[in-house]
Amino acid sequence: MAVPFVEDWDLVQTLGEGAYGEVQLAVNRRTEEAVAVKIVDMKRAADCPENIKKEICINKMLNHENVVKFYGHRREGATQYLFLEYCSGGELFDRIEPDIGMPEPEAQRFFQQLIAGVVYLHSMGITHRDLKPENLLLDERDNLKISDFGLATVFKHNGRERLLNKMCGTLPYVAPELLRRPEFRAEPVDVWACGVVLTAMLAGELPWDQPSDSCQEYSDWKERKTYLAPWRKIDSAPLALLHKILTENPTARITIPDIKKDRWYCRPLKKGTKRGRVSSGGVTESPGALPKHIRSDTDFSPVKSALGEDKASYSTSQPEPGTGGALWDSSTGSIDRLVQGISFSQPACPEHMLLNSQLLGTPGSSQSPWQRLVRRMTRFFTKLDADGSYRSLRDVCEKMGYGWKQSCTNQVTISTTDRRNNKLIFKVNLLEMESRILVDFRLSKGDGLEFKRHFLKIKGKLSDVVSTQKVWLPPP
């Protein structure tokens, strides 16, 4: 069920939410173009309106193949709309298997693309300050895109660099100087975060809670105890690079030009690890035609029998990572009209707009445009009907001590704490697809790797009712 937004445009899916708003997927019913719309409630952001303005200004400055494209913005009353590239490949963390990681050639390619994006940002005098897998998106060709510039700032202008003094970011990814020094340089901070992201990709876990002497894992790293996890899971060549990146002293830390000369970084990718070829910026250029549009007219009725009528209120919040990836020329008139806007209307229950056939298909069949919607591994079919699926999920979550709240007719919100005692919130949607029930999990707040760990635990507890039928994901 699509909800009209602006003339010819429908909001069809919630992509993410946070403290001040949410991100919705908008689809043009005539041209089938897709755009991510970041919707910010300026009343909720009343304490930091300048941050929103700065985010818009920074987005306007950027244009790079490894950075989510910004199409424009519009203010409508107390609501600010940011129109961004839509990335159908989802978040990077979804490709990381908890405690395992991903194949080394894959990690190398994503790391090269991350570095290419950071090089560009720094060349524009911009530092991101919150690089992590949740803020790194993948397009339909599995190209990495840096997203979410809510914490970004300008550190260099007209060749003059300023030191930073604000501690911000996500603790496992922040550089140690943020915790110790009143002022610090911007570029080494982003370099450090890239190293933590690479560790997560290669080992499937974060190296520490925070880079301080009070953290045993960090102390072990400084003492070069690489026989411990996660380092023992990483090959010697990338580990040697990580030693140079995750160097405590920022003046001794490797710079990006030297990273690009590193032996492992420059090693040719193994054959058979990707489709197409890689451009000079590390972007995969897949052969053959790619679908450029997404339909928005599929009829979809959410599961009602199990969860009853709508009865929960919604809070809009600043979008968590989860937007990006365009498939068309942004100069098209339809996108211009979307940005300019005519009549805006908000959905009563955003998750009712989940798409009916976004996952359905059989290997070898021709793909419909729906199958280019967000690819996620955190979903499965069940052997039960809607009522049975709902009850089984509820019983397992209650036994595991999770918080449980019905959010929408076909959605529940589950809350818990992760291994670091941080809040973890995810949404679960029960979708009826051709007489089958798909249980779809989406991270709402918290660490992506921890979210995947909890998903796997829940799926394991539901093994008796999980269908052996695979949720086929279209290849990149």
From Swiss-Prot:
<dbReference type="GO" id="GO:0005654">
    <property type="term" value="C:nucleoplasm"/>
</dbReference>
<feature type="binding site">
    <location>
        <position position="38"/>
    </location>
    <ligand>
        <name>ATP</name>
    </ligand>
</feature>
<keyword id="KW-0131">Cell cycle</keyword>
<dbReference type="GO" id="GO:0006281">
    <property type="term" value="P:DNA repair"/>
</dbReference>
<dbReference type="GO" id="GO:0042770">
    <property type="term" value="P:signal transduction in response to DNA damage"/>
</dbReference>
<dbReference type="InterPro" id="IPR011009">
    <property type="entry name" value="Kinase-like_dom_sf"/>
</dbReference>
<dbReference type="GO" id="GO:0000077">
    <property type="term" value="P:DNA damage checkpoint signaling"/>
</dbReference>
<feature type="active site" description="Proton acceptor">
    <location>
        <position position="130"/>
    </location>
</feature>
<comment type="function">
    <text>Serine/threonine-protein kinase which is required for checkpoint-mediated cell cycle arrest and activation of DNA repair in response to the presence of DNA damage or unreplicated DNA. May also negatively regulate cell cycle progression during unperturbed cell cycles. This regulation is achieved by a number of mechanisms that together help to preserve the integrity of the genome. Recognizes the substrate consensus sequence [R-X-X-S/T]. Binds to and phosphorylates CDC25A, CDC25B and CDC25C.</text>
</comment>
<keyword id="KW-0963">Cytoplasm</keyword>
<feature type="region of interest" description="Autoinhibitory region">
    <location>
        <begin position="391"/>
        <end position="476"/>
    </location>
</feature>
<comment type="similarity">
    <text>Belongs to the protein kinase superfamily. CAMK Ser/Thr protein kinase family. NIM1 subfamily.</text>
</comment>
<feature type="modified residue" description="Phosphoserine; by PKB/AKT1">
    <location>
        <position position="280"/>
    </location>
</feature>
<dbReference type="Pfam" id="PF00069">
    <property type="entry name" value="Pkinase"/>
</dbReference>
<dbReference type="GO" id="GO:0045839">
    <property type="term" value="P:negative regulation of mitotic nuclear division"/>
</dbReference>
<feature type="domain" description="Protein kinase">
    <location>
        <begin position="9"/>
        <end position="265"/>
    </location>
</feature>
<dbReference type="GO" id="GO:0007095">
    <property type="term" value="P:mitotic G2 DNA damage checkpoint signaling"/>
</dbReference>
<keyword id="KW-0723">Serine/threonine-protein kinase</keyword>
<dbReference type="GO" id="GO:0005524">
    <property type="term" value="F:ATP binding"/>
</dbReference>
<dbReference type="GO" id="GO:0046602">
    <property type="term" value="P:regulation of mitotic centrosome separation"/>
</dbReference>
<keyword id="KW-0158">Chromosome</keyword>
<dbReference type="GO" id="GO:0000785">
    <property type="term" value="C:chromatin"/>
</dbReference>
<keyword id="KW-0418">Kinase</keyword>
<dbReference type="InterPro" id="IPR000719">
    <property type="entry name" value="Prot_kinase_dom"/>
</dbReference>
<dbReference type="GO" id="GO:0035402">
    <property type="term" value="F:histone H3T11 kinase activity"/>
</dbReference>
<dbReference type="GO" id="GO:0045814">
    <property type="term" value="P:negative regulation of gene expression, epigenetic"/>
</dbReference>
<feature type="modified residue" description="Phosphoserine; by ATM and ATR">
    <location>
        <position position="317"/>
    </location>
</feature>
<dbReference type="GO" id="GO:0010569">
    <property type="term" value="P:regulation of double-strand break repair via homologous recombination"/>
</dbReference>
<keyword id="KW-0206">Cytoskeleton</keyword>
<feature type="region of interest" description="Disordered">
    <location>
        <begin position="272"/>
        <end position="329"/>
    </location>
</feature>
<keyword id="KW-0067">ATP-binding</keyword>
<dbReference type="InterPro" id="IPR017441">
    <property type="entry name" value="Protein_kinase_ATP_BS"/>
</dbReference>
<dbReference type="GO" id="GO:0000794">
    <property type="term" value="C:condensed nuclear chromosome"/>
</dbReference>
<dbReference type="GO" id="GO:0018107">
    <property type="term" value="P:peptidyl-threonine phosphorylation"/>
</dbReference>
<dbReference type="GO" id="GO:0106310">
    <property type="term" value="F:protein serine kinase activity"/>
</dbReference>
<feature type="modified residue" description="Phosphoserine">
    <location>
        <position position="345"/>
    </location>
</feature>
<keyword id="KW-0539">Nucleus</keyword>
<protein>
    <recommendedName>
        <fullName>Serine/threonine-protein kinase Chk1</fullName>
        <ecNumber>2.7.11.1</ecNumber>
    </recommendedName>
</protein>
<keyword id="KW-0234">DNA repair</keyword>
<dbReference type="GO" id="GO:0006974">
    <property type="term" value="P:DNA damage response"/>
</dbReference>
<dbReference type="GO" id="GO:0005634">
    <property type="term" value="C:nucleus"/>
</dbReference>
<keyword id="KW-0547">Nucleotide-binding</keyword>
